[in-house]
Amino acid sequence: MIWHVQNENFILDSTRIFMKAFHLPLFDGSFIFPECILIFGLILLLMIDSTSDQKDISWFYFISSTSLVMSITALLFRWREEPMISFSGNFQTNNFNEIFQFLILLCSTLCIPLSVEYIECTEMAITEFLLFILTATLGGMFLCGANDLITIFVALECFSLCSYLLSGYTKKDVRSNEATTKYLLMGGASSSILVHGFSWLYGSSGGEIELQEIVNGLINTQMYNSPGILIALLFITVGIGFKLSPAPSHQWTPDVYEGSPTPVVAFLSVTSKVAASASATRIFDIPFYFSSNEWHLLLEILAILSMILGNLIAITQTSMKRMLAYSSIGQIGYVIIGIIVGDSNGGYASMITYMLFYISMNLGTFACIVSFGLRTGTDNIRDYAGLYTKDPYLALSLALCLLSLGGLPPLSGFFGKLHLFWCGWQAGLYFLVSIGLLTSVVSIYYYLKIIKLLMTGRNQEITPHVRNYRRPPLRSNNSIELSMIVCVIASTIPGISMNPIIEIAQDTLF
């Protein structure tokens, strides 16, 4: 009888433990509902690909796009909710993280229609491409919300591994293989450096891995001003710098941009910067709270080098994708100004707003490059000469996106930079803002040089690629034009309503 009662108690206790263990991930899963939608989309893609003999390509695009749109919708429905920490402190949900997650989802949603015709023309495997895009998006979203060092590293590697695979997706292309090799080697080295920095942070805080607990641990161990923290700061800055690609951590960027498939470059050029910026902001702001002067100085140096080197070297480029690679290095210098300013003078709000505009400007430019490259097979800047005479719509779209990247009024890029520089000026970053203004003028030069080529009408300057250019029917390239139209509109009109956008960002953050 006693044995029977004990056996029943054991079963009841075991059931309670099991239900508690099951309830925790089930309850916490509601905090990552947008990510769960993407996971479900990934599983659905895999199941259809593995079970169906006759694969309908349009279904793969539909499932991927629908997953992303549903994830955005789920994210918007929980907008401005109270901050929550889930999964035993590993993941944090707040307004700041959700804005960056929204930007990553927006990038991926625009990149998929941009890739449709390219994949069909190059006959690349579609399912794997979409799987890598969705998995990289998932990794970027988890990176934005990661609340401890281990989750940050795992999410970062999830994003990085998919990036390596995407950059080498055209296996028969020698340039793509070379770009992937460089990207993989430098990415592995930067990850090792980042983990080494994390180990110093872990040891100095007394064995803490959660970001806020690291601060408490540093106070308890009195190590917040120790040399170990400065070593951790240096190594972590180098590791994250690889993802942001500021100078001098930019060596991989031009080769990867030139060798990778153009839709992949479009995807990586924005998502990597958005995810890395979100992670860098939280790492610098929380664990290195007591070393703000040191990391401000480090980031100022990186921003100055990026703005000067990126824009000056871009002038000499003959490849459109390499030019945009160096342009992106300069652009990240402007974004770093917002990270340095922080939330004291609206730095975060202006940085997020500029990133929103940068996504539209950059993806719009790449949509034009994809469209032109599919019809001509060239990437040389000189081969764009006279494009306006053959395809005015494409030429005007490219010109507007480039002018917005350069920051000419009244386009979105101008107002984004203006507000970013104004926040930096109010924060006392006079030298940094002055460098930003000067390098913006330099960038206008090489953007205008391309626009001049586009608009030329003299026959002797029109290249054979443009002379033999044939615009296909609209229905054959409507997916690229869909992304192009959205990005061109976002690159031109929203700048006029800049103040409401900034106010929305500030109200959401604070």
From Swiss-Prot:
Per the record, the major location class is plastid
Q: Which domain of life is it from?
A: Eukaryota
- Between which residues do disulfide bridges form? none
Q: Which GO terms describe its molecular function?
A: NADH dehydrogenase (ubiquinone) activity; quinone binding
**InterPro entries the record matches:** NADH-Q_OxRdtase_suN/2, ND/Mrp_TM, Ndh2_N
Q: Which reaction does it catalyse?
A: a plastoquinone + NADH + (n+1) H(+)(in) = a plastoquinol + NAD(+) + n H(+)(out); a plastoquinone + NADPH + (n+1) H(+)(in) = a plastoquinol + NADP(+) + n H(+)(out)
Answer whether the UniProt record assigns the keyword Cell membrane to this protein: no
Membrane-related topology note:
Multi-pass membrane protein
Instruction: Name the Enzyme Commission number(s) assigned to this protein.
Output: 7.1.1.-
Instruction: Name one matching Pfam family.
Output: Proton_antipo_M
Tell me how this protein assembles: NDH is composed of at least 16 different subunits, 5 of which are encoded in the nucleus.
What this chain does, per the entry, is described as: NDH shuttles electrons from NAD(P)H:plastoquinone, via FMN and iron-sulfur (Fe-S) centers, to quinones in the photosynthetic chain and possibly in a chloroplast respiratory chain. The immediate electron acceptor for the enzyme in this species is believed to be plastoquinone. Couples the redox reaction to proton translocation, and thus conserves the redox energy in a proton gradient.
What is the official name of this protein in its record? NAD(P)H-quinone oxidoreductase subunit 2 A, chloroplastic
